[in-house]
Amino acid sequence: PKQGENFEPSPGFHEGNAWNYTFFVPHDIKGLTKLMGGNKKFVDKLQSVFDRGNYAPTNEPNIAYPYLFSRFKGEEWRTQKLIKELLAKHFTNQPAGIPGNDDTGTMSTWAIFSMMGLYPDCPGVPEYTLTTPTFDEIEVKLDPKYWGKDKLVIKKEGKGDYIKEIKLDGKKYGKYLITHEDLINAGEITFVTMDR
């Protein structure tokens, strides 16, 4: 914790390195994409984080990185593939079943959101990036006094790992980002899945 204090030499990063922090600009992915030279260069560099083994699922700075692919049309499948692989590899039902320190529930929360098929990848922005849920049906109890409804239902149709279609209350929804308000007002979100 005292590294870099009193002008001591420091690597410039805490609990990570340049790979872990390069894409940590959740509030301005569009600006970062432009800075990197466009969509293809951004996606290629992001994919290299995973291909080279530089993704660190044990710490917060880059835990949202798998979800960034869904910001680019046609690349959403990468998010869906990575989330399934990361859940299987790093989260088990054993005493040490989470990667690293849970840091006040951060890693457990990442796993729960990911299993539900949605993740709030930008702190302070009330929206979620969508991915394939783990379970066939999830029912989230809501207090109707605050939400106007008593539940949010998340359904997965089919046995595939990839999303073919997303529906809100039975109507086609063509995006992989959803606002908190739209999600709660919908009452039901259905992920129709397929094999790649």
Kindly label every feature range from the protein language model:
Residues 147-152, 173-174:
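Short, isolated positions in well-ordered beta-strands
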Residues 1-148, 181, 187-190:
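Active-site core of glycosidic bond-cleaving carbohydrate-active enzymes
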Residues 157-196:
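C-terminal beta-sandwich/jelly-roll accessory domains of carbohydrate-active enzymes
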Residues 142, 152-158:
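Beta-strand-rich recognition domains
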